[in-house]
Amino acid sequence: MVRTLIISAASGAALMFSATAFAGGQGPEEAKAMLQKAVAAVKADQTLALIMFVKGEGGFLDGDLYPFCFRIADGKSLATPKAVKAGSDVKSLKDSDGSSYGLELFAAGQKPEGEITEIKNYKFPKPGTTEPLFSKISFVTKVGELACGVGYYK
């Protein structure tokens, strides 16, 4: 009985470890941690932070995690993944299902500074690809005149 319980527990732990390893360990906690790091970088030196975000430098490209930023006044994308053209209007973004997730991103940027909004289940390509599209969840917050976010893929 005890041996069966130990084997079952070990098997369950192995399955959990495998699922975490397969996911790359990049979920909501890692996305929120990178968002906090991005917010600190923007507050310290906005211009340098945006350059690092675009280039994926300073730890701002970790597997599928990366920050993005846009101006809260007009929604103009300033730091974006390659799948979104820099300078485009974030409000016009729609996924392959027609979901206007860009309007949700923009609305999240209008909330009080420091408030983090979760944007759920829109489809977006992973970094360096244009297809296929994957289900993504992003966390967005206002930082001065910008809104920045980091998302993870499900």
Model-derived features with residue positions:
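N-terminal membrane-sensor/transducer module of prokaryotic signaling receptors
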Residues: V2-S11, L15-K154
